[in-house]
Amino acid sequence: MKSDIEICQTATLIRMKTIASNLGLHDDDITPQGRYKAKVNIDALKHLEDKPSGKLILVTAITPTPLGEGKTVTTIGLAQGLAKLGESVSACIRQPSMGPVFGVKGGAAGGGYSQVAPMEELNLHLTGDIHAITAAHNLASAAIDARIYHEQRLGYNIFSEKNDLPALRIDPTQVVWKRVMDHNDRALRMVTIGKNEDNKTINGYEREDGFDITAASELMAILALATDLQDLRQRIGRIVVAYNLDGLPITTEDLQVAGAMTVTMKFAINPTLMQTLEGVPTFVHSGPFANIAHGNSSIIADNIALKLTDYTVLVATLRGIKANSGLFPLSSGQSLPKALFVPNQEALIAGLDNLHWHIKNCAKYGLPVVVAINRFPEDTQEELDFLADWVTSQSSELNLDVAISEAFGKGGEGTRELAQKVLIACAQETEFTPLYTPDMSLLDKLTAVAIKGYGAERLELSEKAQQQLAMFEQLGYQHLSVCMAKTPASISTDGNIKGAPTDFIVPIRELRLCAGAGFVYALCGNVMTMPGLPEKPAFMNLDIDSNGNITGLS
């Protein structure tokens, strides 16, 4: 079989104006970015608002191996399968970060015959949204250190009188807004800035700082959650970047930088329209880090897609289930054990607890579940049939169906059965049931996620986390939602614990406030917001020929 990039480069694509026109978008709704991608003006929603909304299908996955189990492949393949059945359909996916593209995971355009194209443009820069977020984020960082420098250089009173601005009195030890870049670079996790020679302060005042990957920026989460340009502006203005000497929050609005940050992101609020290899429209927008934010593409892209064209598809793989048996050592950045790719009934049976946990977890929210068994070339029909039969055996107690997906090898033709079963699920009446309500305290919300969501015995907050929790409540942030930042390699907070653990403790070492995005996230265990490169990074495979053709991207 050809490589992903070879398949993509030999595909016949449709001009973007045709894709947009077939969707019902007007010429002035899009701004072409070359032949095969275009920005969709957010104002398109105004002439679409009276149209009925379509069905929203959420694709998630079991506890993954480091290479992922195929959420994007399944999303794209399912969209192509629905199109094969004559349905009006579009896909919505996140924009890939270049960090993982150059690291261990590679690109995020799907794979095989279920890809978004051109995949090299999607994986590398696209329309520059991530760079705009990086620039806006680091503008706030520069504003913080400039304000500290000038206020301390002149003194608070003189600074205020000279510039007709209030002295913010930022505590340099309480700056919570790190800098960002769109690469994996562990050496930048902790840095010292403002270093000078001979006791001078020309380079600013020295303090400890660090870098996160841009996908971990609160701005990325805000872009994904904002509903329009005004909402984006208001959310950016609420971002807390530091605390003053009295312990009170300093926002980007206080720094008077929120407007400039929004201006920098003005173009980024518009989703990018692309297509799958089979010409299915695909909206690509935002890319929040999934383990410290909600990890979905944008609400704006979803709203536009729903007007143009409420159920869960759970992706499982044989290797993913075997990996959750606990019989094989797994390590991020390392190759998967070869034993995961050969028939092993013992490992398959031992790993079923993890799939069962995820099925029940989806069912908690009141949604019907369709399990998509994502087929890999090395999978045997015997093991695939065994897994499908096992899922079917669980359907008597749960609203559940199953289909083997061959999206990778066959595109939309390989997901016809999955698409038919998803359509049946979409015809059902459902009522979404959240784990907690907005009026609950932050502690009760965190406890609900840990106990009701993960099946933990209890929470265990560090002294620092307890102090932060009390401060956030005192400052009036108790109404915010919560997010758990933990390893994706386990249901628990320990990546070495596989399967479906119970009665474990969820340790919270630190809480971080995202007032603009609208949530508080808890750092559980050793979660990194700036990834590092593996021993053999994916960038070693990338090259370009004299004709500009890229090779080695997957």
Curated annotation (Swiss-Prot):
Pathway: One-carbon metabolism; tetrahydrofolate interconversion. One of its GO terms (molecular function) is ATP binding. Its EC number is 6.3.4.3. The keyword Nucleotide-binding applies. GO terms for biological process: tetrahydrofolate interconversion. ATP binds at T65, P66, L67, G68, E69, G70, K71, T72. Transmembrane segments: none annotated. It is an enzyme of class 6 (ligase). Keywords: ATP-binding, Ligase, Nucleotide-binding, One-carbon metabolism. It catalyses: (6S)-5,6,7,8-tetrahydrofolate + formate + ATP = (6R)-10-formyltetrahydrofolate + ADP + phosphate. It holds the Pfam family FTHFS. Belongs to the formate--tetrahydrofolate ligase family. This is Formate--tetrahydrofolate ligase.
